[in-house]
Amino acid sequence: MNGAELKAILKDGGRVFGTMLSLSRNPRWLPVLDGVGLDYAVIDTEHGARSRGELGDFLTMMNTTGVVPIVRIPIPDSHYVTMAMAAGAQGILAPYCETVDEVKEVIGAAKWRPLKGDAVRRVVETGEHVSEATKAFLEERNKNSIAIIGIESVAAVKNLEAILDVPGIDGIFVGPNDMSISLGFPDQYDRPEYQSTVKHVIDTCEARGIACLVHHQNPELSSYWINQGARFILHGTDRRALTEGFRTEFTELRKVADDLPK
């Protein structure tokens, strides 16, 4: 799958499945992701420790698989967008966006690279292009580019309709930890206030034909939000998969050993 194919699935009302890679730095193991049921993976550079060179190697290897690489950039800034895309990302996730101006900057860099300055501002704000030839060239060049906007605070939710008016958004990301903290109930995901807020985000986005990602760590919570309408499904992390895999298997092995005669 590539970015254009992933976007087409979402546009048709389908679902795609992915995970977050926050711990891994060595790209040699990435080909195994091709057969585990992932459509995409988000490489976390907001919280994960990777150099620019390491990210480039990571993306080069991931692009040999059928898993679409999306980079979560540190902040909603055009410099980080273009840096990730130039390194080989087929999409970006811009965290903690609260204003229309932030979103316009991200979309301009993700969808119309390498256009800059006043030219990209006019494209994003008015749809005015330098020429039809330039428009066609940039659309073809960036056809795989995926732009995901992070809605992770009360302020962002209040501004959601205006943010969604910016053309070019392919997905809206809800970060449960940040959102619950902003609501005043850190990590209390069963609170009605949290659930109603996230449901409002999903419903508002779906009314515009935009799919949502709600990133939870356990299958029960991820399943809940799939049932509530999340279609851009983002579940778990490499760290959790490693931890839970070891815990499950070594618990089983210790039980076998404990059952043996002393």
Model-predicted regions and their roles:
Residues 1-69, 75-76, 108, 165-169:
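Conserved N-terminal beta1-alpha1 strand-loop-helix module at the mouth
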Residues 91-105, 172-181, 230-249:
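Glycine-rich phosphate-binding active-site loops on the catalytic face of alpha/beta enzymes
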Residues 77, 118-130, 145, 151-158, ...:
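C-terminal alpha-helical cap/extension of soluble enzyme domains
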Residues 16-21, 41-43, 69-73, 92-94, ...:
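Hydrophobic faces of well-ordered beta-strands that scaffold small-molecule active sites
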Residues 79, 89-167, 181, 262:
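Conserved anion-binding
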Residues 1-20, 131-143, 199-200, 206-207, ...:
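N-terminal amphipathic alpha-helix/helix-capping segment at the start of soluble metabolic enzymes
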Residues 52-86, 108-118, 139-142, 190-213, ...:
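Alpha-helix-loop-beta-strand connector modules within alpha/beta enzyme cores
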Residues 36-40, 86-91, 111-112, 165-171, ...:
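Glycine-enriched alpha-helix->loop->beta-strand junction motifs that scaffold or abut catalytic
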